[in-house]
Structures are given as structure tokens and as C-alpha cells.
A protein has these predicted regions:
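Noncatalytic modules at the cell exterior or secretory-pathway interfaces
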Residues: 44, 80-98
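Short hydrophobic/aromatic-rich beta-strand motifs
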Residues: 43-49
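Hydrophobic beta-strand residues in large extracellular and virion-surface proteins
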Residues: 27, 48, 56, 87-89, ...
Length: 104
């Protein structure tokens, strides 16, 4: 398990919830499930965004299906993940791209 990041504070010492962007990937969204490469062994949160609606699955060897979580088009979401896992994506309607950013 990775060590939590130190919380950033404002001028009055109040915590500001913030994460630093790390490595990123772009995965094609199509009619077959596609996987990202394995996330870093320290990554526990990812930021995802797609230009099309799509289904997402997470795990060691995930396959996204039409019963998985739906990410609406042009929406940013953050998910907790297991270090070293992968993200799988499947189109909901049309083809596009899923952007994944490992947050630290």
C-alpha cells in the first residue's frame, strides 16, 4: 500500500484536497474491450475522462462489458484502484478515446 500524500494547505493552514498528476495513458474506445497498461505499483487513484460514453472495468485482467460502470461522455471521474491494476474500456455508443491519469 502506498503512503498517503501530504495534504497541501492554504495560507491559513487549512487543508486543500489536491493530488499531483502522474503518468497518463490514452486507450482507444471501441466495440471490443480494450485494456490500459498496468498502473504504477504506487498508484491508488486515477482520473479518467472520455470523449464518448463508455463502460469501465478495473482489475488485474479486466474485460469491460455492457453491464459495467458507465462513464458519460466528456465527464471527469476519480476512482480508487489497486496498485498495478488495469482499466478496461468498451464503447457505449460510438468510438473515441479514454484518458487515464495516475494521481499522486
Amino acid at each position: 500500500m502506498s503512503t498517503p500524500t501530504k495534504m497541501v494547505t492554504d495560507h491559513a493552514g487549512r487543508p486543500i484536497p489536491a493530488l499531483t498528476p502522474g503518468d497518463s495513458q490514452r486507450v482507444a474506445v471501441g466495440s471490443s474491450s480494450a485494456q490500459s497498461t498496468a498502473l504504477d505499483s504506487e498508484t491508488i487513484i486515477v482520473r479518467v475522462q472520455s470523449d464518448v460514453a463508455c463502460y469501465l472495468a478495473f482489475g488485474d485482467n479486466p474485460t469491460a462489458t455492457n453491464t459495467d460502470l458507465v462513464l458519460p461522455a466528456n465527464t471527469v471521474e476519480y476512482f480508487g484502484v489497486t496498485p498495478g491494476s488495469k482499466v478496461a474500456v468498451l464503447q457505449f455508443g460510438g468510438a473515441g478515446y479514454l484518458n487515464i491519469v495516475e494521481m499522486r
